[in-house]
């Protein structure tokens, strides 16, 4: 416990908050164009081919976005919407591509958690 004199000499400093999604620039989502769509492998101990896309945003940032769900229709020059949210086992992937918005189609035959994957209600 510091004394009053110690606090006068060197006041308490608040910890510096680091922005986890700098490319969004305090916006909830950003639009961008896919420059490369590819698969990558996760860190140990996981094993898969995760679908990701490199996206050039409208503000000039170039980020890597994860494509959630089974199957996708994205290719180079597809216009996509990006939201924050990292993928824990993919280093450098700090954004998610939103399904069912702009050029990204929703997941086919999705029955549960449809809103997360842009799927319409089945008849």
Curated annotation (Swiss-Prot):
The keyword Acyltransferase does not apply. Part of the 30S ribosomal subunit. Contacts proteins S8 and S17. May interact with IF1 in the 30S initiation complex. This is Small ribosomal subunit protein uS12. Signal peptide: none annotated. The modification 3-methylthioaspartic acid is found at residue 89. Changing residue 91 to L: In strain: Rev.1; induces streptomycin resistance in this live attenuated vaccine strain. It comes from the Bacteria. InterPro entries: NA-bd_OB-fold, Ribosomal_uS12, Ribosomal_uS12_bac. GO terms for molecular function: rRNA binding; structural constituent of ribosome; tRNA binding. Belongs to the universal ribosomal protein uS12 family. With S4 and S5 plays an important role in translational accuracy. One of its GO terms (cellular component) is small ribosomal subunit. One of its GO terms (biological process) is translation. It comes from Brucella melitensis biotype 1 (strain ATCC 23456 / CCUG 17765 / NCTC 10094 / 16M). Pfam families: Ribosom_S12_S23.
